[in-house]
Amino acid sequence: MSSVLKAFERFTIEQELQDRGEEGSIPPETLKSAVKVFVINTPNPTTRYQMLNFCLRIICSQNRRASHRVGALIALFSLPSAGMQNHIRLADRSPEAQIERCEIDGFEPGTYRLIPNARANLTANEIAAYALLADDLPPTINNGTPYVHADVELQPCDEIEQFLDRCYSVLIQAWVMVCKCMTAYDQPAGSADRRFAKYQQQGRLEARYMLQPEAQRLIQTAIRKSLVVRQYLTFELQLARRQGLLSNRYYAMVGDIGKYIENSGLTAFFLTLKYALGTKWSPLSLAAFTGELTKLRSLMMLYRDIGEQARYLALLEAPQIMDFAPGGYPLIFSYAMGVGSVLDVQMRNYTYARPFLNGYYFQIGVETARRQQGTVDNRVADDLGLTPEQRNEVTQLVDRLARGRGAGIPGGPVNPFVPPVQQQQPAAVYADIPALEESDDDGDEDGGAGFQNGVQVPAVRQGGQTDFRAQPLQDPIQAQLFMPLYPQVSNIPNNRIIRSIASGGWKTKIYYDTTRMVILNKMQGANTETLSQTIPIKTHSCKWATGMSKSLT
């Protein structure tokens, strides 16, 4: 039997690795589009600044062809290079297009009419057509310029430093558009605005040279539609990663933005590794996870086998990215998302409520994270030389903070299908409920819950762990998640315990919600509760022995 299991594990791993071809193999050749890329061999800042504006206008032009836009993008990203002729050769590696370099000496004064070099293969009609395209901006571009400020294009640029500041300000906006061009291009631009603000604060982006939002959108669309451009940008990202600490401004900027681009489309895979395998908690030993753990092992080996380009699978449209989809390991993905939703507040921005998300294993992750937050890693504690008293102090500190965090309903179940704003209601929602005094005998053997300032708080069990069993449920989905775990609570939705009385070997609990009051009896030491009486709230009011009256109408 063990040989069969080893063979299955080896088969699963080889299944992920065997369908890859050798690195550098040439794919079957298909039809290629001819792309003209304009090259300037002079370091003249005025000419290069004119080429920068010319490329922006070609990208935004409403009558340009796809090849015109691709050539303008490659020329735009190559402008900081001292030798554009050699730098553009990076694009020659693409099997998608035939790159044709056209050397340009400059522009006619006051126009965007090209002055070609004698070696450039450009006809007079093509030169006139490019000049018309540069002036043919769509009506969605205001003031006849891609920039927010209308006078930016006409400003003189006679110093290399001026050109580099303007060029880097434009290119950094184009690179920010690359971040979401393949994974979330249709999402609101809040993340892009935050990155623009970051680079303005760092001095890498001058606000005066900001492009109009429509121009930024057209650049992003052009990058998204062109595999040639994205392959070229991937080579640039790899060059930036290889740079040392002493690097030029451009590749330092590209390396910084590359951190937002790396592993895009693989978020679910890396979050699963972080919160499922990284925590090393006991639920990983469940038999249901055995096959999926083997799957994760094979995916980690595949990622290493792909090499440096594995970080840019989404940017390259590589088919291997489908192997990392969380639908291939749904149970352990659900468990990891439950753990992450408790440990990491940034998980609120990640959409993990997929159709294959298993609510039961998600809740296992939630409960495990809540109960294990105060545990101490013995290996790390030994390395730090912590005494048993110090370890207990750390555990008690975390438990105390977890109980008193006060984010709405303490210890309430996390529901992946409800927005976080609805889940984390402030404690003030119970301000209209007076604090009911509990009897002296309010500590249940089974982990009851008490009141503090009118809000129910989880009880502390032996070992410093927090008991979340007697918590109110907020919606049917949450009740469904908790029902197989705690049926004695889930059968009374939206309830609050308002009285717990122990007398004569019996323990009585009184619950109420908006329509009824329910009385449950349980013999001390028993595990089940018996329904004693249900009273409509609208016709009943009662007085407690403490002297506090509560009208339930």
From Swiss-Prot:
Its main location: virion. Residues 405-553 are annotated as: Ntail. Ncore is globular and carries the regions required for self-assembly and RNA-binding. Ntail is an intrinsically disordered monomeric domain in the C-terminus. This is Nucleoprotein. The keyword Cytoplasm does not apply. RNA binds at residues 180, 195, 260, 350, 354. One of its GO terms (molecular function) is RNA binding. Forms the helical nucleocapsid (NC) with 12.71 N subunits per helical turn and a rise of 5.3 Angstrom per N subunit, protecting the genome from nucleases. The encapsidated genomic RNA serves as template for transcription and replication; encapsidation by N is coupled to RNA synthesis. Forms the encapsidation complex with the phosphoprotein protein P. Before encapsidation, the newly synthesized free N protein, so-called N0, is chaperoned by P. It comes from Mumps virus (strain SBL-1). The gene is N. Homomultimer; forms the nucleocapsid. Binds to the viral genomic RNA. N0 interacts with the phosphoprotein (via N-terminus); this interaction allows P to chaperon N0 to avoid N polymerization before encapsidation. Interacts (via N-terminus) as N-RNA template with the phosphoprotein (via C-terminus); this interaction positions the polymerase on the template. It comes from the Viruses. GO terms for cellular component: helical viral capsid; host cell cytoplasm; ribonucleoprotein complex; viral nucleocapsid. It is found in: Virion; Host cytoplasm. Residues 1-398 are annotated as: P protein-binding. The lineage of its organism: Viruses, Riboviria, Orthornavirae, Negarnaviricota, Haploviricotina. Belongs to the paramyxoviruses nucleocapsid family.
